[in-house]
């Protein structure tokens, strides 16, 4: 085993599953040994998929690190050549532009600061961070919980310097999941801290919206949608759809069906600045979805 991962903010285990699918010369090269999440349902799901990992249903800010350190020592003894990776998919809601003009939770925006005690206790070889692009704009908030424009990015840069002070170098990239064969288009910040002379390597792009001889075309979400499941017709409803929902469907009919297509997506927050709805198609990757289900596939 080349890499041993500790997954903070592990959720139901998407990152952990990706880590353990990694292969080097057709052999598994990475293993998730421990994970932390405050949500018991997320941990239950993670444990079902990764039963060999040590699970902590705790807030990362208050977790007693002694059991984690003890477990890590045992894993290091079993895999003495393995490098230790601390992965943190920091809570992103209060950085994201999807938050709009709403106030931010100042406490949530400081979760990255709580990584320092993990760094000191674990001394990882690598630290890998995933978040929304706006993480780089992290700065102070005013009395109303709104970002102060003149302080944009100051907290982020200060945090970077603090992590570097532990002997790490740092690189980051903004990567789109669709560029790596996913059925969704989602841009995210990925940052890698590496100790000493350890290399920092990002994956090579495999797909593109405009492919060439080296890159494949983006994958169409149509390929993973079950159009045999017709759902419920919008006609004959006890309560008719509101006008905004009908306008979103109408926009898709005009954009796609009038042009000969038989299916399209309806997205809740799809209105442009000009006040027009822009329906996504099914021949492209799915646009970003959120925890509440405001994305639908429509077939004529």
Per-range role (PLM):
Residues 1-32, 162-169, 184-299:
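S-adenosyl-L-methionine-dependent DNA methyltransferase catalytic core
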Residues 2-122, 132-150:
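Core alpha/beta nucleotide-donor-binding catalytic domains of modification enzymes
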Residues 58-60, 177, 291:
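Active-site donor-binding loop signature of nucleotide-sugar glycosyltransferases
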Residues 74-78, 177-179, 274-277:
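Short, P/G- and charge-enriched loop/turn segments at secondary-structure junctions
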Residues 90-91, 124, 132, 183, ...:
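Proline-centered helix-kink/hinge sites
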Residues 110-193:
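Conserved Class I SAM-dependent methyltransferase catalytic core
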């Amino acid at each position: 085993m080349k890499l041993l991962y500790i997954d903070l903010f592990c959720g139901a285990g998407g990152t952990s599953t990706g880590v353990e699918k990694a292969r080097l010369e057709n052999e598994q090269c990475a293993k998730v040994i421990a994970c932390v999440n405050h949500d018991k349902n997320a941990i239950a799901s993670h444990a079902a998929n990764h039963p060999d990992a040590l699970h902590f249903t705790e807030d990362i800010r208050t977790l007693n690190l002694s059991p984690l350190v003890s477990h890590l020592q045992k894993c290091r003894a079993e895999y003495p050549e393995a490098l230790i990776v601390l992965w943190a998919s920091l809570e992103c809601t209060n950085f994201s532009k999807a938050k709009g003009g709403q106030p931010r939770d100042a406490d949530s925006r400081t979760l990255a600061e709580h990584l320092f005690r993990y760094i000191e206790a674990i001394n990882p070889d690598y630290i890998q961070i995933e978040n929304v692009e706006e993480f780089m704009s992290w700065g102070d908030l005013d009395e109303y919980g709104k970002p102060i424009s003149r302080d944009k990015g100051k907290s982020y840069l200060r945090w970077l310097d603090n992590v570097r002070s532990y002997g790490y170098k740092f690189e980051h990239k903004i990567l789109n999941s669709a560029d790596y064969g996913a059925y969704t288009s989602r841009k995210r910040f990925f940052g890698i801290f590496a100790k000493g002379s350890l290399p920092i390597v990002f994956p090579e792009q495999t797909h593109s919206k405009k492919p060439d001889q080296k890159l494949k075309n983006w994958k169409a979400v149509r390929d993973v949608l079950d159009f045999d499941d017709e759902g419920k017709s919008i006609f004959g409803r006890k309560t008719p759809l509101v006008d905004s929902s009908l306008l979103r469907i109408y926009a898709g009919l005009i954009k796609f069906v009038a042009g000969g297509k038989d299916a399209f997506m309806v997205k809740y927050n799809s209105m442009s600045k000009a006040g027009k709805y822009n329906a996504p198609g099914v021949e492209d990757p799915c646009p970003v979805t959120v925890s509440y289900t405001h994305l639908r596939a429509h077939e004529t």
